[in-house]
Amino acid sequence: MIPGEIMAAPGDITLNAGATPLTLTVSNTGDRPVQVGSHYHFAETNAGLSFDRDAARGMRLDIAAGTAVRFEPGQTRDITLVPFGGARKIYGFNQGIMGAL
């Protein structure tokens, strides 16, 4: 083994296995790009993004950890969200929840 080497099990890895996905259409109505990270509470994203925020409550992007999605000004795209796991408590972000979902 080489120091730092990772020996992964054979086969494919399924991200967010077992999570119930939700697809929403999101539009950037602002004049600047908006980038949203993989674990950001999507309902609390930049006000320039137009989408059903109530439906997105307690959800995050269904993308690999450490990655992000960028919305250019005027761009509309479909995104997939998955529920936060664990204790389902949200703190920080834009302080819209600050506790249990």
From Swiss-Prot:
Keyword Iron on entry: no
Gene3D superfamilies for the chain: Urease, beta subunit (2.10.150.10)
GO molecular function: urease activity
Reactions listed under catalytic activity: urea + 2 H2O + H(+) = hydrogencarbonate + 2 NH4(+)
First-level EC class: hydrolase
Keywords: Cytoplasm, Hydrolase
InterPro entries membership: Urease_beta-like (IPR002019), Urease_betasu_sf (IPR036461), Urease_subunit (IPR050069)
GO biological processes: urea catabolic process
Compartmental location: Cytoplasm
Pfam families: Urease_beta
Enzyme Commission numbers on file: 3.5.1.5
Coiled-coil ranges from the UniProt annotation: none
Pathway(s) it belongs to: Nitrogen metabolism; urea degradation; CO(2) and NH(3) from urea (urease route): step 1/1
Main location: cytoplasm
GO cellular component: urease complex
Domain of life: Bacteria
HAMAP family from the UniProt entry: Urease_beta
Quaternary state and interactors: Heterotrimer of UreA (gamma), UreB (beta) and UreC (alpha) subunits. Three heterotrimers associate to form the active enzyme.
Homology family: Belongs to the urease beta subunit family.
Protein name according to UniProt: Urease subunit beta
Organism: Dinoroseobacter shibae (strain DSM 16493 / NCIMB 14021 / DFL 12)
